[in-house]
């Protein structure tokens, strides 16, 4: 899980790989994988799971990739000693990963410093959708639509977009317009979403 409220001990045990208290669970995973058709490559969805890299690599002899996409937000939710220990454990296991995939140039630069990952070991694959083969659809309405698709949190700036939308509506007068927002929202961001709704109520 990437829930920052989970106990620090659980995070550390996940990062300690098969040398921690979760060794039995790691062994079960490895035994199961050995009995299945082997993949061409294994991708860990975030660096908080890097403790699996070594055991999986040894069991499958397949390349290990690890996606980097904002783990520092969850690490910052840990209490000081746990955060420092978690970062140290991730750094210790960077060598077990063949390739890191960052979702932006900023992420690549930030994670290079945070986890001491050699920059040459990181490939940048921006988030997005390939539009080849698709055509623009006609609008189903004349409304001017502003869209937001990202995690709902202050650092993503939905409140800034809401303020801008309020100004836009005032400049547009009675012309039809709407703001459509979608994305993951953690339980700890409910009050933030209510603040954004309050801003939009002025539109």
Label the predicted regions.
Residues 131, 153-158, 174, 187-190:
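A short, basic/aromatic alpha-helical/loop segment that forms part
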Residues 138-156, 162-166, 179-180:
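Conserved donor-binding/catalytic core segment of Leloir-type glycosyltransferases
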Residues 1-41:
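Conserved nucleotide-sugar donor-binding subdomain of glycosyltransferases
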Residues 41-43, 56-74, 123:
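Active-site proximal beta-strand in glycosyltransferases
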């Amino acid at each position: 899980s990437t829930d920052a409220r989970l106990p620090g001990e659980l995070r550390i045990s996940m990062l300690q790989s098969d040398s921690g208290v979760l060794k039995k669970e790691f062994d079960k995973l490895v035994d199961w994988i050995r009995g299945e058709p082997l993949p061409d490559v294994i991708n860990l969805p975030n660096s908080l799971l890097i403790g699996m890299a070594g055991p999986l690599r040894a069991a499958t002899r397949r390349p290990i990739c690890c996606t980097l996409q904002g783990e520092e937000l969850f690490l910052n939710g840990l209490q000081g000693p746990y955060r420092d220990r978690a970062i140290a454990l991730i750094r210790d296991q960077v060598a077990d990963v063949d390739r890191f995939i960052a979702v932006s140039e900023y992420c690549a630069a930030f994670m290079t410093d945070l986890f001491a990952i050699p920059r040459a070991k990181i490939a940048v694959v921006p988030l997005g959708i390939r539009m080849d083969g698709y055509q623009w659809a006609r609008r189903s309405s004349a409304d001017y639509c502003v869209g937001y698709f990202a995690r709902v949190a202050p650092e993503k700036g939905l409140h800034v977009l809401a303020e801008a939308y309020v100004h836009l509506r005032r400049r547009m007068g009675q012309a039809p317009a709407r703001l459509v927002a979608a994305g993951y929202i953690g339980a700890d961001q409910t009050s933030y979403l209510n603040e954004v709704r309050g801003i939009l109520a002025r539109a």
